[in-house]
Amino acid sequence: MAQKTLLIITDGIGYRKDSDHNAFFHAKKPTYDLMFKTLPYSLIDTHGLSVGLPEGQMGNSEVGHMCIGAGRVLYQDLVKISLSLQNDDLKNNPAFLNTIHKSPVVHLMGLMSDGGVHSHIEHFIALALECEKSHKKVCLHLITDGRDVAPKSALTYLKQMQNICNENIQIATISGRFYAMDRDKRFERIELAYHSLMGLNHTPLSPSEYIQSQYDKNITDEFITPACFKNYYGMQDDESFIFINFRNDRAREIVSALGQKEFSGFKRQAFKKLHIATMTPYDNTFPYPVLFPKESVQNTLAEVVSQHNLTQSHIAETEKYAHVTFFINGGVETPFKNENRVLIPSPKVTTYDLKPEMSAKEVTLAVLEQMKLGTDLIIVNFANGDMVGHTGNFEASVKAVEAVDACLGEILSLAKKLDYAMLLTSDHGNCEHMKDENQNPLTNHTAGSVYCFVLGDGVRSIKNGALNNIASSVLKLMGLKAPATMDEPLF
């Protein structure tokens, strides 16, 4: 088995048993009908833990293409950190241990919610308890959310934090994210949060009383005025500080204010030394230890093909061009050796339901040209099912599927003539579920499975799997050995 190969990604076309409001089901699709009758096919998972997202969370094009190209599950920060904490890995985490052991006092700061966008309260609690096990005095600096969660939910999360408080763990300060998590260089906001960290802005109220007093002034969680509580007198030289947010953009300014000598946003108390660590990499210029470093994605599908001096072409229209280049190549912007890229402009319409065929025909012509040139691997994305599905227009989504089907017919016909192998799948679903139970349009991705079809010498059946099984399957069709980092093929 060693064939030139097509990897076709039909973006947003998923599997759904129910035919109601299912644009894929209702489309006239002779090519798909032929593939169902003549090719082995299976179902592929594209959401939740199978692609490194939290359980039940819908997949997306960025994560999907990364997973396809890497050939393995790349856990997103929220999941990666949660799994590590569940496995009790903190006790062996060098950045964490080195930071907390430099001082008897450890300051933990971060967004206090389970929104999962910037942080998670479970991470906050786990770090605090691990610090306590090491006999540290722990000062909690709580940032209230109200944006990724309900605007007046802080008291619920505060209770969870209070449940771990004792003589060694205390709530030291509080601040709305509007202040402590600014990202627009509005340093007058950061300054207020910074002052509370320094032991200024004292309130005689308890944390719960203080939050309620803010509510009484019609101030919601996002905008809670920074304050510090009794028995907290500010950070001191030589103490340790960990910022627990895993998303970096809204963490940089407050960390810069605490640790960067060249910071000039406002006048600050000068520290000789604070032992700072961050949850993930926040900025390339930061010298601080990182508890969960960015994972380097190597030996991707494109890289392996390039290592064998084979040719490849990555083709998509504008809407999905980054996905078949940057994302499928593991976050690498520069093309690999012998990698050709073809960008087809997307049509200039307000919304794609006005032109559901989008630029699929032009994309197909580029694919056919590369096949005639004998390119060893052709990766192509058809954007229609996703981009038209996002409009919520059922009739247009049916036309989008029909347009893709016609293009697939041309490609499949030439593939058989030129002895190309083919693997066809989707990065996630969308257009197979267009209305909810109340008949309102559904415009989001679906959290379900997608089809996978294979045309290849000797391939009679394929297993169910997930997107992490695609790269090794493509390499097998090409007669190439998959690297040990990749998960098993589907056949």
From Swiss-Prot:
Active site (record annotation): 61
UniProt keyword annotation of Isomerase present: yes
One GO BP annotation of this record: glycolytic process
Chain residues that bind Mn(2+) 2: 11, 61, 427-428
Residues reported in the UniProt entry to bind substrate: 118, 147-148, 177, 183, 247-250, 320
Cellular component, GO, one term: cytosol
Keywords: Glycolysis, Isomerase, Manganese, Metal-binding
EC nos: 5.4.2.12
SUPFAM superfamilies per the UniProt record, alphabetical: 2,3-Bisphosphoglycerate-independent phosphoglycerate mutase, substrate-binding domain, Alkaline phosphatase-like
Signal peptide bounds: none
Pathway: Carbohydrate degradation; glycolysis; pyruvate from D-glyceraldehyde 3-phosphate: step 3/5
Manner of cofactor binding, per the entry note: Binds 2 manganese ions per subunit.
Binding site residues for Mn(2+) 1: 386, 390, 445
Entry's Gene Ontology molecular function annotations: manganese ion binding; phosphoglycerate mutase activity
Cofactor(s) this protein requires: Mn(2+)
Catalyzed reactions: (2R)-2-phosphoglycerate = (2R)-3-phosphoglycerate
Isomerase in keyword set: yes
Subunit comment: Monomer.
Family, similarity comment: Belongs to the BPG-independent phosphoglycerate mutase family.
Function of the molecule: Catalyzes the interconversion of 2-phosphoglycerate and 3-phosphoglycerate.
Protein's UniProt name: 2,3-bisphosphoglycerate-independent phosphoglycerate mutase
Organism lineage string: Bacteria, Pseudomonadati, Campylobacterota, Epsilonproteobacteria, Campylobacterales
Gene name of the record: gpmI
